[in-house]
Design a protein with these regions (language model features):
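An acidic/histidine-cluster motif and surrounding catalytic segment
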Residues: 1-75, 80-283
Length: 283
């Protein structure tokens, strides 16, 4: 992030959560010492939590606070590697679509779609496109969109029917509805699935790059919310984004490519067994 174009013109707010358990306090202290040495930004403000909020509550509180103050926000978690042009992409998109009410979210991550694009469209995808689902690995939004965020899972669920569940789940190719049900059952504490559901129910759109501008390196098993998984690993695009969609509608070719990726992402039974064995060996 420090090496991004526009970093030296950006205000950086770092939200440091408190330790969830006593044995984690030393690690939190080390992280807080590290972030105090960060430089390269126009302004840096560190918000140290005195009690553990957890990822979901920390994100919701931080985003709500900053969009109220600034009207828009760019959000990174601490396990992301970004292109040097990621901030430029976010800022350009935030300015371009500020008044487009249907555009509610800007994502920086995109699945590795090369094979899917080759089979669905020989001409490839545009640099950026609109899609229905909201990604959480590097994203941005506006106060006018965030005010539509509904944290109450029961209120969200009550607005879905079987058709909407089918569309929400990318025609049952992604476990988004399972995540909703698991949140309801107390099995996860995801802010992201509630945000996507909020966007979806408002018929909102998300802007995305066809080549990912971030990669999540938190899948090595060391992060709190991580798991060994290389399915979503990408090569970060190191070129600036220069074109944005004029038509405010979901890109059908991109949707088909994403659907194909999600349907085949886990590979054959043999590939799944190998991946499972690697996870067990690394545990």
């Amino acid at each position: 992030l420090q090496q991004n174009q526009l970093a030296d013109e950006s205000r950086l707010f770092i939200f440091s959560d408190a330790a969830a358990r006593a044995e984690e306090e030393e690690n939190v202290s080390e992280v807080r010492q590290l972030i105090k040495r960060i430089s390269g930004f126009k302004q840096i403000e560190i918000i140290e939590r005195h009690k553990n909020l957890g990822l979901a509550n920390s994100i919701i509180d931080g985003v709500s606070r900053l969009v109220k103050q600034y009207g828009k926000i760019i959000v990174f978690e601490d396990d992301l590697i970004s292109s040097p042009y990621t901030l430029q992409y976010f800022n350009n998109a935030l300015n371009r679509y500020e008044s487009e009410k249907r555009v509610m979210h800007i994502g920086a991550y995109m699945y590795p779609l090369h094979k899917e694009v080759e089979t669905t469209n020989k001409g490839g995808l545009p640099e950026t496109f609109f899609y229905r689902a909201a990604t959480s690995w590097g994203w941005a939004t506006w106060a006018r969109a965030w005010k539509e965020f509904e944290p109450d899972i029961d209120k969200l669920i009550s607005q879905f029917n079987s058709r909407k569940i089918h569309e929400f789940s990318i025609e049952n190719n992604m476990n988004f509805w399972k995540q909703v049900k698991e949140f309801k059952a107390g099995k996860n504490n995801s802010w992201a699935i509630r945000w996507y559901a909020s966007v979806f129910l408002k018929r909102g759109l998300t802007l995305n790059p066809s080549e990912s501008l971030v990669n999540n390196i938190g899948h090595d098993g060391s992060g709190v919310h991580s798991g060994m998984n290389d399915i979503y690993n990408v090569v970060v695009n190191h070129k600036p984004i220069t074109t944005f969609p004029e038509v405010i509608d979901e890109n059908k070719i991109a949707y088909q490519a994403i659907k194909n990726f999600l349907r085949t992402r886990k590979g054959s039974l043999w590939q799944r067994l190998i991946r499972f064995a690697k996870q067990k060996l690394s545990a």
